[in-house]
């Protein structure tokens, strides 16, 4: 079986290699999805980057739980149980993959992925001088490219079919838990415990998204929850900025702005992430949008522009020095 399909998603093409069984599963918010995957480059050799079968353990994600590589939710929710399919994903969807791959590899090696620290080494890496600790991932981060994901869907579990603390709460308890989780996230953030703060924000988002599924989209109650969710996502992105996970910030803020183009904080945060990965024109465009929507932020915007210009000047000077040394 070899059926090519378009998922009506920009930059994604699907080819079914083995058809699954039964109807399309119900992928409600909070469902746990278990699958095997292989990630390959689009070169002639179809170079394998990661393979969960080689690791010996399948992957699981929770639907609606702010997974780093959001496009995987789109891919998985198009599949039936037992289905095997290949998905070609353009660069717009794969920019964060090196960060995800690093975390998965460190977990497989028995390391704590949250203990990683950024190293700096001049112009060794153009993206905020990161090294991910794996040469192939460093190259992939320097030069983002389309990737192919081969996925085999193994299991889909509803929220009440597996043990997860959040889902032991009823709707009223979930709503009561949100401000507590939000407040705890803020407290941890102020203490500099960004990983733990991000987890609290994620838990609150999952609670709200579950509640939101019970409301009619774009009506008053749904919009109230949406506003709360966006606030928490931006708090989560603030943690990501501190952790220097800039591509995930770009993905989440861009998603917010696609649906809510008037959120000033999302433009401001996206501008900062663009600046860190040397997308100077995009950063300037977002900062101009901040000024247009919120003139009172002029001082903060000018500060970010000065910082960006200074970093660009430093980068150009380092490049000149490097060229001089290469020429002797």
From Swiss-Prot:
Residue ranges constituting the PPIase FKBP-type domain according to the UniProt record: 53-145
GO molecular function: farnesylated protein binding; peptidyl-prolyl cis-trans isomerase activity
Single GO biological process annotation from the record: negative regulation of apoptotic process
SMART domains xrefs: TPR
InterPro entries attached to this UniProt entry: AIP/AIPL1/TTC9 (IPR039663), PPIase_AIP (IPR056277), PPIase_dom_sf (IPR046357), TPR-like_helical_dom_sf (IPR011990), TPR_rpt (IPR019734)
SUPFAM superfamilies: FKBP-like (SSF54534), TPR-like (SSF48452)
Xref: Gene3D superfamilies: 3.10.50.40, Tetratricopeptide repeat domain
Compartment(s) of residence: Cytoplasm; Nucleus
Membrane-spanning segments: none
Function: May be important in protein trafficking and/or protein folding and stabilization.
Name assigned to this protein: Aryl-hydrocarbon-interacting protein-like 1
Protein species of origin: Mus musculus (Mouse)
Taxonomic path: Eukaryota, Metazoa, Chordata, Craniata, Vertebrata
